[in-house]
């Protein structure tokens, strides 16, 4: 079961060992995949099915290293090509897989609590942003489909930066667009890569562990919310 990543009040996040009263929260920045929509399961399912088509197995443990980043040390497409070899139209095969993932994701709702936390942020006058290692077309497309695009003053994706999470660039760019210093901002993240990025940017961070990473060490986050 997916945890409600927005069940904690963003203003309640404390810097480890710090005092939030001295640094009031003025902005909240959401991750996207796994936080606003539960898209990770479709991605891993389509890749696992493709691996199985060629008699191979893609473990959840290995897949989990990709969650939250576009700069992982391995890529499923490259690994599959290397393992299976030539004689296949890999571009067409991968395009077919991607099209299936996109189609499966078109009916995904906003995760429980998203609308409520956005309403809370509006009521409190907080700046709201998205910082995602996914592409802009993917993120903005789903936000538009959900009727949420105009709820975000800053939308920063991998298309806007040179490095994705765990590098802090996505978050520093989002904060610059919001005009808020990192000590006055909270990130909400489901991945370890995302938590590392948020903390490196100088933000407080609420971690809602992705189900694939539920047993990982999220101690660097300021708050952890489990299902």
Identify the meaning behind each predicted range.
Residues 2-26, 119-122, 135-227:
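Asp-based, Mg2+/Mn2+-dependent phosphohydrolase catalytic module
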Residues 36, 110, 128, 163, ...:
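Conserved SAM-binding loop
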Residues 57, 127, 204:
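Residue-level detector of anion-binding/catalytic polar loops
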Residues 33, 67, 128, 193, ...:
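Short glycine-rich loop/turn motifs that provide flexible caps or phosphate-binding loops at active sites
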Residues 21-124, 137:
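N-terminal helical cap/lid subdomain that shapes the substrate entry/recognition surface
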